[in-house]
């Protein structure tokens, strides 16, 4: 993609005003930047590695949107891959900038001198403060990087990658690409019968399923036992994944109908609103049924990471159906792609906010107190975030659940320290884990 042309009056210089190319406004790009900081910041408060990986993957997308913009699906996809590609083009751009600074008497040597003075001041005052307070000295020691040969190599590699990323980001901010013109080829429309008949048939099928679901919801477990011959938990487990797939596929069907259905006549527009509106409303009932099934299943067998994550995904799909319903009624959906990504990021941040590993541990500890059933082996595999909840277990279950977490080490370095691990260390210091506890073998759900 070619960068946007220079703003008028700048004579083709590199100083192009961000947002001058029709990309999302500064407020939208600032929102993506804030989302990126929040996603990366999850690692400073949560110890769950699986959660941080998901947040980093989402941050890759939001970083591209913050730097490059993009409103259409294709533009948003391209913005994701632009930052690493921009690094190569940023190198000659940075070289020209440094040459211009030297010509103006502001060479790179003065920048290095400023950095050297800053490091010197930090070193002198850091040594004085460390010698004055032992606690501050321990904190500073934990934050200092490893100065061994392997440590220096690791940190040098990291800073080179970070510097390259920052350079590419600076290039995109000063020379934003024009992504709003990236749209797919116009889709050919089909005749009314070719899209209305399949949608009407699908609406009828959804309506029949929804009637059955309402019967189950109001009839309860007795109705399921009489008609399906299954326990309520087995019934819930058997259908959740299918309903999750139905929810995702329905969104694809709606997207295809919106793309290929004609809207030239008033009759076509009314049919789109009625058929797609009905499908969207019925899909919300399917989402509610899936969520109810997962609730029953979790109450019967306990909470796990997978069950909590797919529940979050199902809530997100329900929100998408609401947004799609609004777009169908208005027959406008240009804002939907950004809201799809935005709501996904919000759902992920919401999952991080509830502290999923601790939430899972608390749910299972409460369930143990009510039923006496507990999967100690699974809980022992949770992260340090779960320690405050697992600390409520009686011995020897407490030590059995916390032993592997405590043995993982303090992890106080700059790259691994976070709030979750700090809380766990404090609890282990106050209530050490018993190394000689005998762990029961048959605590499974």
How should each PLM-predicted stretch be described?
Residues 6-25, 94-111, 139, 169-199, ...:
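Juxtamembrane membrane-water interface segments of multi-pass membrane proteins
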Residues 333-337, 349-374:
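Hydrophobic alpha-helical transmembrane segments in integral membrane proteins
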Residues 144-158, 227-245, 303-315, 381:
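Short aromatic-rich membrane-water interface segments that cap or initiate transmembrane helices
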Residues 372-381, 389-393:
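Structural detector for internal amphipathic alpha-helices that build alpha-solenoid repeat scaffolds
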Residues 119-135, 205-222, 287-296:
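Alpha-helical transmembrane segments and their membrane-interface junctions
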Residues 385-445:
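Extracytosolic and intramembrane catalytic regions of membrane-associated proteins
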Residues 28-38, 117-123, 203-207, 245-251, ...:
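Hydrophobic membrane-spanning alpha-helices of multi-pass integral membrane proteins
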Residues 1-138, 154-178:
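Transmembrane-helix bundle segments that line or gate the permeation/cavity pathway
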């Amino acid at each position: 993609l070619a960068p946007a042309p220079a703003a008028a009056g700048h004579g083709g210089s590199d100083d192009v005003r961000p947002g001058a190319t029709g990309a999302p406004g500064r407020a939208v790009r600032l929102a993506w930047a804030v989302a990126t900081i929040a996603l990366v910041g999850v690692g400073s408060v949560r110890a769950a590695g699986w959660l941080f990986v998901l947040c980093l993957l989402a941050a890759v997308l939001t970083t591209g949107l913050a730097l490059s913009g993009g409103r259409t699906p294709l533009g948003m996809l391209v913005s994701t891959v632009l930052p690493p590609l921009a690094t190569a083009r940023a190198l000659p751009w940075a070289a020209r900038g440094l040459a211009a600074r030297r010509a103006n008497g502001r060479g790179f040597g003065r920048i290095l001198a400023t950095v050297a003075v800053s490091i010197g001041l930090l070193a002198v005052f850091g040594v004085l403060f460390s010698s004055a307070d032992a606690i501050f000295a321990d904190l500073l020691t934990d934050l200092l990087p490893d100065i061994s040969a392997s440590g220096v190599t690791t940190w040098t590699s990291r800073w080179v990658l970070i510097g390259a990323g920052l350079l590419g980001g600076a290039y995109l901010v000063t020379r934003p690409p024009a992504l709003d013109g990236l749209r797919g080829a116009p889709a050919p429309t089909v005749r009314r019968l070719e899209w209305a008949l399949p949608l009407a048939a699908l609406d009828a099928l959804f309506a029949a399923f929804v009637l059955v679901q309402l019967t189950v919801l109001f009839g309860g477990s007795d109705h399921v036992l009489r008609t399906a011959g299954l326990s309520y938990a087995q019934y819930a487990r058997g259908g959740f994944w299918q309903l999750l797939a139905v929810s995702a596929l329905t969104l694809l069907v709606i997207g295809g109908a919106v793309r290929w259905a004609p809207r030239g006549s008033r009759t076509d527009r009314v049919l789109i609103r009625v058929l797609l509106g009905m499908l969207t409303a019925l899909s919300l009932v399917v989402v509610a049924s899936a969520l109810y099934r997962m609730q029953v299943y979790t109450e019967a067998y306990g909470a796990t990471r997978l069950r909590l994550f797919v529940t979050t995904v199902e809530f997100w799909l329900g929100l998408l159906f609401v947004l799609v319903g609004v777009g169908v009624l208005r027959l406008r959906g240009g804002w939907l792609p950004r809201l799809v990504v935005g709501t996904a990021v919000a759902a992920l941040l919401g999952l991080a906010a509830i502290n999923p590993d601790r939430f899972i541990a608390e749910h299972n500890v409460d369930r143990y107190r009510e039923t006496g059933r507990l999967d100690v082996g699974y809980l022992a595999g949770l992260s340090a975030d779960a320690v405050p909840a697992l600390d409520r277990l009686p011995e020897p279950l407490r030590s059995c659940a916390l032993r592997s977490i405590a043995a993982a080490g303090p992890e106080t370095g700059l790259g691994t320290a976070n709030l979750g691990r700090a809380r766990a260390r404090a609890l282990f210091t106050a209530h050490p884990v018993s190394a000689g506890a005998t762990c029961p073998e048959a605590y499974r759900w």
